[in-house]
Amino acid sequence: VADKVNPRHSAAGFKLYTRPARAPTLKTFMQTAEAYARCLALTRSHYENFPVARMVPRRLQPAVAAVYAFARTADDIADEGVDRPGGAILSTEERLVRLRDFDDALLTSELGKPTPPEWDWIFTAVADTRAKYNLPISLFRDLLSAFTQDVTVKRYATFADLRDYCRRSANPVGRLVLLLHGFNDEKRFVESDAICTALQLANFWQDVAVDWKKGRVYVPQEDWGRFGVTEADFSAATASPGVRQCLRFQVERTRGLFDQGRPLPASLPFPLNFEIRITWLGGSTILDRVAAQDYDSLRARPTLGTLDKVRLLLRGFFSI
């Protein structure tokens, strides 16, 4: 498989069939430009939650912003119960309905048909980005599937179930980033998947107390009995010995996933390799912080300080 592909060609080099496009009118050009501008504004307003966006090459910033706006809006519906700024908090059923509407709008935009006015700017930008970079619609639908699961699923019976959730909630983002940069090969995808899943898991082990307050427990239930853990243990102010042992087990197997993805940055050009390396180091350091607290994420949420972030930047730069 070619390392780098023309976004309008398949990995084998064959030109992909596309329907003949109509010549863009000034109106559609302006609508698309305005859609991207709104996506960029949303992304910039959330730089604290999406710092890697600052390092994206200028030519890719509109496309990355379109992907971010899509994911952010759907996540807000699922997690915050808000489908528009200043809107009322949605019930569980209303969230599911709006997520179905969002999925329908994605499919409608695929056909070049109008989408709901409140989301038209998002799907205008996403449709244009998908066409330019040949991004599979399945990756966007996987994200929506995971957001829908956030509304209805609060416990995970097995680690395999949790991995499947991460496959849809985290891995598509890494694959989209690679595709936007022109990389489309299975080896990089597998390594990216390992990093993205590990990042998602690291966040779970960091946020055990935070998630409990939201009614969620991501620690697989199959491991509770093994370490003598009960659901009530997650409501305590400090972690029991069983919870600590269980989280130690989760942290160690998450490190194994980070190790699987470790070769990825070396196969990528600057600045993408730097971005991925910083991301990898950040997730690994979160696991270090969980371990440094003796695996007690109930007592206090492990975080990275300013000095930690400076060290990550230096390590990321000099390890390339």
Predicted stretch roles:
Residues L26-Q200, W205, A209-I320:
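Catalytic cores of Mg2+-dependent Asp-rich isoprenoid enzymes
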Residues V1-L26:
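Intrinsic disorder/low-complexity segments
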